[in-house]
Amino acid sequence: MTDQQAEARSYLSEEMIAEFKAAFDMFDADGGGDISVKELGTVMRMLGQTPTKEELDAIIEEVDEDGSGTIDFEEFLVMMVRQMKEDAKGKSEEELAECFRIFDRNADGYIDAEELAEIFRASGEHVTEEEIESLMKDGDKNNDGRIDFDEFLKMMEGVQ
């Protein structure tokens, strides 16, 4: 077992591994311990993942190192964990986009110092003008006096 495979197993509960194994085995028709790359998309969709054709091609290219056209169960686990992490990252970015829209009171695509102060006041948090200025300075990477969505994402990376 490679380090990647051991890491993938440590990320998953025994229940998840058993669920993945059951799905994997359904497509391992001959019981040989591997599935064809063509069947991979079907298995992933059964397990609640939604890879695009491009993502599947990239995943398969990474996983099927020997070019055999088949993927064994350990390689499959590594791939599923990668996909789960990607999905989680996408969801958290969607949630942050929703927060940004809420904070951007005037819907101009930016959060300014006044909007930032309002956020804290609404949450009952007492924040001084200096603290607001400091937060703006830290978040406003291009020094235009306001925080755009990309700057907001970078700011929030440090919080999570």
Swiss-Prot record:
Q: Is Transferase included in the keywords of this UniProt record?
A: no
- Positions binding Ca(2+) 4 in this chain are 140, 142, 144, 146, 151
In which residues is Ca(2+) 1 bound? 28, 30, 34, 39
Identify the GO cellular component terms for this protein.
troponin complex
Single biological process term from Gene Ontology: skeletal muscle contraction
Molecular function (Gene Ontology), one example: actin binding
Positions bearing N-acetylthreonine: 2
Residue positions binding Ca(2+) 2:
64, 66, 68, 70, 75
Ranges for domain EF-hand come to 15-50, 51-86, 91-126, 127-160
Q: Which residues bind Ca(2+) 3?
A: 104, 106, 108, 110, 115
Task: Tell me the keywords, alphabetical order.
Answer: Acetylation, Calcium, Metal-binding, Muscle protein, Repeat
Please list the tissues where expression of this protein has been recorded.
Answer: Fast skeletal muscle.
Q: What else is known?
A: Skeletal muscle troponin C binds four calcium ions.
Q: Which family does it belong to?
A: Belongs to the troponin C family.
Chain's role: Troponin is the central regulatory protein of striated muscle contraction. Tn consists of three components: Tn-I which is the inhibitor of actomyosin ATPase, Tn-T which contains the binding site for tropomyosin and Tn-C. The binding of calcium to Tn-C abolishes the inhibitory action of Tn on actin filaments.
This chain's protein is named: Troponin C, skeletal muscle
Q: Which organism is it from?
A: Mus musculus (Mouse)
